[in-house]
Amino acid sequence: MDIKYSVDLIESYLDLDRTPVGIKFFFDWEEFEKFEVPQRDRKVTYCNSVQLASRGKAMKLTKENQGCPNGAMALKMREVPEPMANGKGRLSKNIYHNIEISKSISDEMLFLEEEPVGIAVMPLENYELEPDIIIIVSNPYNIMRVIQGHGYFNGYTSNLRTVGLQAVCQDLTTYTYNTKDINITLLCPGTRLVANWQANEIGIGIPFEKWYEIVQGVKETTNPFERNKEKEGIQKRLRERGLDASNIRFNENYDDGSYSGGKIETRG
């Protein structure tokens, strides 16, 4: 499997409104400059750069491009100020009940440990080099299917963490980068404002090391989990891309014969 084929597969097996986004960190200036994608000439929040990439835009970013202080902190392009680190900053805005809880949020977030010289944010299908992180923002049904694809090879996902804050920058990017594992987010009010996500959209971050097996897992779990209506769409999208659709089996699901109904006899 390669990147282009994996995108063809995932966009066939899932009915995505947005294309998967690849994130690559550069820690060498020469490598960053040689990466043939134009650097954005304006400020942008990191989360909105992901949103733009999900609609086909490709860009490189440096610390000068960062339009959100919290996103820049997660990416280690800005130092974490003391009021944020000690919990007083968020407590002052009544985000958390007390200083202990507020500080625990800062303590438990996983930011980059080394500052990158730059970041590439673009549609996954555009990459020739391997990105570090893949982000999919979609409806809960599609994120469920990605989780099921992950579970096919990995079992239970035990370390999902989110708190409705720093959703794209920390939940989906730096937390995933540090743990080398998937994570989900329900997004946060900030990114929903500046990136204008739809109300029903949530996200999942995937380390590239797990990407191909997740795509394969989504494919393998299609017949047990997808209903006939969804299978019709999958079959159509596969054929439109010239991909093999012969493995799609209708009238077959994991829960066949499991449910019962009808009138019951009551006592008395």
Give residue ranges: language-model regions.
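Acidic, serine/proline-rich low-complexity intrinsically disordered regions
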Residues: 3-268
